[in-house]
């Protein structure tokens, strides 16, 4: 049964157990969903990334990144936009931290820009003192306002000099350079920051950048649908596996350095993965298809950091195109995360692909799967999707994904490192009566927070934090500024003015500290 977003009367009635089960989180008993419904100490925050918000690309000796070069070289692939100014977080972070306070959040996920610290990619070629100080000032301001930082070391902004020298993550030479940079950040900020992420979305970084050519550096083979004609270089079905392999080896070495860092004692480190959930389209053999695509989407990077090697299904399918880890690398990779970061947005139907051309390999042909937000004949859509939405809304997928990770990966600590609703308002983008009344985003957050609460309180999944994407509208990669994900609206034509959306008002109420729900009331929202 499909439930329309608009005109929906949403009734959220939540009954949690006040007593501890044999294992798992303890949830207070509440009648309505609020901050009070989550376990004691549960953190709520917002998330951003350096390239998407900072701007100031030519200040403080910052060097160019992969994405700076890409947006200038291929403007038609990013809506003719760039992030030279972005939302000017570099100069306005104090103002934006007050927006976080207004939301009643107590966490903030940020990323450090590698070329803002090492303009040319390596320490020996120079350190930007201003860049280093910027992150000190930002972290200090967060802590002064009782907001806990979660810091991502790499969020796709490879220094351009390393791209030019040896192809960035296409070369194993990236490993020592990344580890040097990561180790520098650990020792520089480790006494203030206790929560770290080495890499953001390795699946997206490798597949979108090096297999389908959708994101920087925009590499793919000519036979790839949609972007094949745009890609000037690349080798789909080969390069994404090389990139991820180097990334995983770099992660293991960086974690080894982190665990030896005296300043970092008591800290935690992980990777932010970006799996969707998948429902089987065909009943016969459907679950096998789902299991296979999950191996290729999340197991690709989570299996090595948990068990020390790639999923067997990937090794069988990809064969010699999938690099092999040495025994020493496997030993370092195994149990190399303290938590599993999850960026969840949407879900798909998965269907076995029987029409694979092995002469033109890609990640998708190796996975032997097709996935879409609707069935092949279009008769059934997964969840619901308003006309302006970037992705289908399917909160059940979040709960199912949490349970899957708990069961397959030995019940790890999980942090929701991103979750949010994106929309393209088209010609209504500057119509504030539309843009600020983002009821669909409010609905999305309500449904997903309810699903997350059920995963924690009923399924006993060990989720400890939730970070909303995003604090504010920003540069959304290939979509430029046309896709809005923020709970604060950015007026890109009027001094980057920040404006509160309806979702921000709702979230602020939801997160009010000490809020106790009325015993006789339930939450009704006219959407």
From Swiss-Prot:
It comes from the Eukaryota. GO terms for molecular function: beta-glucosidase activity. A beta-D-glucoside binds at residues 52, 155, 200-201, 345, 418, 469, 476-477, 485. Disulfide bonds join 220-231. PROSITE patterns: ER_TARGET, GLYCOSYL_HYDROL_F1_2. The active site is at 201 (proton donor), 418 (nucleophile). Its EC number is 3.2.1.21. A motif (Prevents secretion from ER) lies at residues 524-527. It catalyses: Hydrolysis of terminal, non-reducing beta-D-glucosyl residues with release of beta-D-glucose. One of its GO terms (cellular component) is endoplasmic reticulum lumen. It is an enzyme of class 3 (hydrolase). It is found in: Endoplasmic reticulum lumen. GO terms for biological process: carbohydrate metabolic process. Keywords: Disulfide bond, Endoplasmic reticulum, Glycoprotein, Glycosidase, Hydrolase, Signal. It holds the Pfam family Glyco_hydro_1. Residues 1-21 form the signal peptide. Glycans are attached at residues 183, 462, 495. Belongs to the glycosyl hydrolase 1 family. This is Beta-glucosidase 19. It comes from Arabidopsis thaliana (Mouse-ear cress). The gene is BGLU19.
């Amino acid at each position: 049964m499909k439930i329309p977003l608009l005109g929906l009367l949403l009734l959220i009635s939540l009954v949690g157990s006040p007593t501890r089960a044999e294992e798992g989180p303890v949830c207070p008993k509440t009648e309505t969903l609020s901050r009070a419904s989550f376990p004691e100490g549960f953190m709520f925050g917002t998330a951003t990334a350096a390239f998407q918000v900072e701007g100031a690309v030519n200040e403080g000796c910052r060097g160019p990144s992969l994405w700076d070069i890409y947006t200038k070289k291929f403007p038609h692939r990013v809506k003719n936009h760039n992030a030279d100014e972005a939302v000017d977080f570099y100069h306005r972070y104090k103002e934006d931290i007050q927006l976080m306070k207004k939301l009643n959040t107590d966490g903030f996920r940020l990323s450090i820009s590698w070329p803002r610290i090492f303009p040319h990619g390596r320490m020996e070629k120079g350190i930007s003192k201003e860049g280093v100080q910027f992150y000190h000032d930002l972290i200090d301001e967060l802590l002064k306002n009782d907001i806990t930082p979660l810091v991502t070391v790499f969020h796709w902004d490879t220094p351009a000099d390393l791209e030019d020298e040896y192809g960035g993550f296409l070369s194993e030479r990236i490993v020592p350079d990344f580890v040097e940079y990561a180790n520098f950040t650990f020792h520089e900020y480790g006494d203030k920051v206790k929560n770290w992420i080495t890499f953001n979305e390795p699946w997206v970084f490798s597949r979108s950048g090096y297999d389908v050519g959708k994101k920087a550096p925009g590499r793919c083979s000519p036979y790839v649908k949609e972007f094949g004609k745009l890609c000037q270089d690349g080798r789909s079905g080969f390069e994404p596996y090389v990139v991820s392999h180097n990334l995983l080896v770099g992660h293991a070495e960086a974690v080894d350095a982190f665990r030896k860092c005296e300043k970092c004692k008591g800290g935690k480190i992980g990777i932010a993965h970006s799996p969707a959930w998948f429902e089987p389209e065909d009943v016969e053999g459907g679950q096998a298809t789902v299991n296979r695509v999950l191996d290729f989407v999340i197991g690709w990077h989570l299996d090595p950091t948990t068990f020390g090697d790639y999923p067997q299904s990937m090794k069988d399918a990809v064969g010699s195109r999938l690099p092999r880890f040495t025994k020493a690398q496997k030993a370092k990779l195994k149990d190399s995360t303290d938590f599993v970061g999850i960026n969840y947005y949407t879900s798909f139907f998965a269907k076995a692909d029987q029409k694979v051309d092995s002469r033109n390999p890609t990640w998708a042909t190796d996975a032997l799967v097709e996935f879409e937000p609707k069935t092949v004949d279009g008769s059934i859509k997964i969840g619901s999707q308003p006309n302006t939405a970037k992705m289908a809304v399917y909160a059940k997928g979040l709960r199912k994904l949490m349970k899957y990770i708990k069961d397959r990966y030995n019940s790890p600590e999980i942090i929701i490192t991103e979750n949010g609703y994106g929309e393209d308002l088209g010609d209504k983008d500057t119509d504030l009566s539309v843009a600020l009344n983002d009821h669909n985003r409010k609905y999305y957050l309500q449904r997903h927070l309810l699903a997350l609460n059920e995963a924690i309180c009923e399924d006993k999944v060990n989720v400890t934090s939730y970070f909303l994407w995003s604090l504010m509208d920003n540069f959304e990669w290939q979509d430029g500024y046309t896709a809005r994900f923020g709970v604060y609206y950015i007026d890109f034509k009027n001094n980057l003015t920040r404006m509160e959306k309806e979702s921000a008002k709702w979230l602020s109420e939801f997160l009010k500290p000490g809020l106790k729900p009325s015993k006789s009331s339930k939450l009704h929202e006219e959407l």
